[in-house]
Structures are given as C-alpha cells and as structure tokens.
Amino acid sequence: MELERALADESLGLDALAEALDRATPSERRSAVLALGRDTQRRLYRLAERARALALEDFVPAERAPREAVRHLGRNTLPLPGSLRFFEKRFSRPDSGAPRLFGYNETPVVRLVGPGYFVAVPTAGQPAWEPRGAVVVDYFRVPDAAVPAGWPRVVPNSRGLQVLVYHHTRDFMRRLSRHVTIGAAYKNERALDHYFVLVRED
C-alpha cells in the first residue's frame, strides 16, 4: 500500500508524509497507522518536532458541541500482549469553553484498571514542555466538570490499578497530519521512550 510505504520511508519529509496521510481513505489511514511499531513511532515523533503546532481543535474540531465525544483510535509501544496495545483516547470540550479538553482511555481492561481520565491543554508558556509538543495530555489532572453521557465515572489516577499506568504521567503530543497525532509518555518529568499514535475518527 502506498501509505504503508510512505510511513516506512525514512527519507520522506514531513510535508510529503502529511500529504500521504491526508490523501488516504479513513480505512487506509487507520490500517496503516495502527500497524506502526516502536522504532517507526519513535522516528515519527522526532520527525514531527518540525510539524505545524497542534491545537486543541485537532483533537476536538471547532464544530463539535460541548460534551460531544470524539474518538481517536490508538496503538502504543508498551511491552504488552499485542491486543492490549490498541486503545482509544476519547476527548470532549467542556461546557465552559475554557481552552482545555477532557478525556479518558477506553481500553480492553478499562473495567479492571480504570479509565485513566486526563485534561489536555496547550503547553504554551511552559518552557520545559513546549519542545516536547504543543499539547499535553495531563494525567495529574482529571475533569472537574461534566463529561459526556455514558463515560465512566471520573476518579483520580491515584486510585486502584490506575496508579501503575496513569499516575504522575503526561503525554506530549505532536502533529503528523489533519487526523493523525503522535505522543511521547513522561513519568514524573522523565521520558519513558514509549510512544503512541492516534487517528481521529470523524
């Protein structure tokens, strides 16, 4: 497939890669992006340092209503069985209209581990964070207002098994294309060398 070749081509520049991702059909984009392994994700995260800065609207487009959920399908590079590397991050805009998003992680083990709630905000004004990505998915914070109907109950990430996965963690996000973002995980300000890709579902 053309897109799979583009993602594997280490000589391909960021603009050409973004064009290939944007040109693909939704099913082609999902299939190719969710097949990316650790080495490729690491390379793409570094490549995306030169990308146009992300905005919150890349996760929840401006035309979406408050508390309307937007699904992003994902694959991570954690040392887990294959099926557990696939997940969803679900985002929504709060009623207040403040420059932040609420979200949680829908995983095969969400009932066992917990939802991993977060607040996503721009990193502008945070000199230590800005070079890592323009948006941070911050697990130190959880929603403090209403979330979409049907989402799990909001609980802090210090509770239960979540402490092993989400507690004291932040994900720093970069843009690959209109629908595709890539993130790097940090624990207590330490880079974990773990990455994940997201494909927004429209």
Label each PLM-derived region with a short phrase.
Residues 1-202:
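Soluble ligand-binding/transfer domains with enclosed cavities or grooves
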